Regions:
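N-terminal alpha-helical transmembrane segments of multi-pass membrane transport
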Residues: 1-82, 92-99, 110, 413, ...
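Transmembrane helix-loop junctions in multi-pass membrane proteins
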Residues: 4-5, 35-40, 83-88, 166-178, ...
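Membrane-interface loop-to-helix entry segments
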Residues: 24-31, 35-48, 157, 174-181, ...
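Helix-loop-helix module between adjacent transmembrane segments
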Residues: 32-33, 106-131, 138, 142-175, ...
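Flexible loop linkers connecting adjacent transmembrane helices
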Residues: 38-66, 90, 96-97, 112-148, ...
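Alpha-helical membrane segments and immediately flanking helix-loop junctions
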Residues: 59-93, 120-123, 129-138, 142-144, ...
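Selective recognition of specific alpha-helical transmembrane segments in multi-pass small-molecule
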Residues: 109-117, 194-208, 219-239, 272, ...
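Extracellular/periplasmic helix-exit of transmembrane alpha-helices
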Residues: 116-129, 231-247, 255, 259-265, ...
Length: 463
């Protein structure tokens, strides 16, 4: 029964990811790039200043809301997950080094999409009498589509995100933690599961502010740790860096030398893997991160929109690219063990471990990857649970949140102990189903986004 269901879900996922999602999300990226006059280029510097150079990002939090930096940290906590390590490796393994080029392309256009999502989340958020803030796709979906159709789409999105991220998604993330740490240290997965579940429960019980507080501490630490480790490897392989970039660009259009097969099939794999992994890594257009950006206290929606763009930049152009450079420079370039294209015995789960271990040594490399996976997966659990929580409140009210949190904690423990392919596939399916109502809403409200971009640009010029 499970095998039959797994087969059905895999076929659904294949159809959704290869046809519907690629068209919708690339289309959204192109559409909003044009409507905002390529805001990801024009306002990139402004976004960087607001994240790294504007001191009021770390203060000015309103009651019930987040500072702009906390909102970004919470979004990045969800964006930067195991996909930045395992997902990048999978794309390279199947699509060749050229897949990374297509990841960059999709991230570039995704920056415009996530700008739109953040702007709409700010425009439609609700501030209650007690100061608490609620916002996210369910609110701008109802703004875009009035009446019963809008309520149906909002409800559909809410159910999908609760299942995809709050429940099944957290389960598969904890599985990554349990497997990685157990393999590196020998500690039983059930022991690791207890610790992860207990830490998760502590953060969940503290509400949205505790999630944001942990996110703004964990995200900088985990990003710096991973980047420092990656730089160590790249310095050791520095003479192969030009070749590494050359392979990324060359095999983006001529990938058959890496993975074999016909030219057409190889090119399709390179593009398909780059696009899919890129979309799922930075989450632009999926409707997850707007929940965090809605919470920020800013002067106008445009301000949080440009901050949101930097989240995609950090996720793809910094963290995911570091994984790609480490893997390609050690395993493919020069005398790399996969230079000949033979990938027997290598999987996406051990590819990063193999790459780091080639420079750091087996023990240190395995432990480093395990620790980074732990940080990435745990931060994703926190972000995803928060996104699910908002939709639970939307559907069932605040009284349902404790029940939601208890179920989530139980699944986190279970996920760390039991590996289930069906759980991974179901998570992917509901994740992809989230995109459809979110896409329809953001495109329907494209005029609102364009107006916010124009107004924000004028205000920036005045300052």
């Amino acid at each position: 029964m499970e095998a039959a269901l797994l087969n059905i879900v895999q076929k659904i996922n294949g159809y959704l990811s290869d046809y519907i999602l690629i068209v919708l999300l690339i289309g959204a990226g192109l559409y909003f790039s044009i409507r905002t006059r390529f805001v990801q280029v024009r306002c990139f510097g402004e976004g960087m200043r607001r994240v790294f150079g504007n001191i009021n990002l770390h203060g000015g939090k309103q009651q019930g809301g987040f500072s702009s930096f906390q909102a970004l940290a919470t979004a990045i906590a969800a964006q930067v997950g195991t996909g930045n390590i395992v997902g990048a490796c999978g794309a390279i393994l199947i699509g060749g080094p050229g897949a990374i080029f297509w990841m960059w392309i999709i991230a570039f256009f995704g920056m415009a999409t996530i700008y739109a999502e953040a702007v709409l989340a700010q425009e439609t958020r609700v501030v209650n009498a007690d100061g608490s803030v609620h916002g996210g796709p369910v609110y701008y979906i109802k703004r875009a589509f009035k009446g019963g159709f809008g309520k149906f789409l909002a409800g559909f999105f809410a159910v999908a995100i609760i299942l995809a991220l709050g429940f099944i998604g957290s389960m598969v993330q904890s599985n990554s933690i349990g497997e990685a740490l157990s393999n590196a240290t020998g500690v039983p997965t059930w022991v690791i599961g207890i610790v992860v579940a207990a830490l998760s429960a502590y953060v969940f019980l503290g509400g949205s502010h505790r999630v944001a507080a942990w996110a703004e501490k964990i995200v900088p630490v985990m990003a710096c740790l991973y980047l420092i480790g990656g730089l160590v490897v790249l310095l050791a392989r520095i003479r192969f860096i030009p070749e590494t970039f050359g392979m990324i660009f060359r095999y983006a259009f001529q990938p058959q030398s890496i993975i074999g097969g016909s030219f057409g099939f190889a090119l399709k794999q390179a593009i398909s893997q780059g696009v899919k992994r890129g979309l799922f890594s930075n989450e632009a257009g999926m409707g997850s991160t707007p929940h965090a950006h809605a919470m920020a206290k800013v002067s106008c929606p445009h301000e949080q929109g440009v901050v949101a763009m930097i989240g995609v930049f950090i996720d793809t152009f910094v963290v995911l690219t570091m994984t790609a450079l480490v893997v390609i420079s050690t395993l493919y370039a020069g005398n790399g063990i996969l230079a000949s294209g033979a990938a027997e015995g290598v999987s996406k789960t051990n590819m990063a471990q193999l790459a780091f271990s080639s420079i750091m040594g087996n023990t240190a490399g395995s432990l480093f990857v395990a620790i980074c996976l732990m940080f990435f997966a745990f931060s994703t659990i926190l972000g995803w649970n928060f996104f699910g929580r908002i939709n639970v409140e939307y559907l069932f009210g605040k009284k349902a949140v404790p029940v939601y949190s208890i179920i989530a904690v139980e699944l986190i423990f279970l996920g760390s102990c039991v590996s289930n392919d069906l759980a991974w596939e179901l998570s992917d399916m509901f994740n992809q189903l989230m995109v459809i109502p979110n896409f329809l809403a953001i495109v329907a409200l494209g005029g609102l986004v364009a107006a916010a971009a124009r107004k924000g640009s004028r205000e920036t010029l005045k300052k």
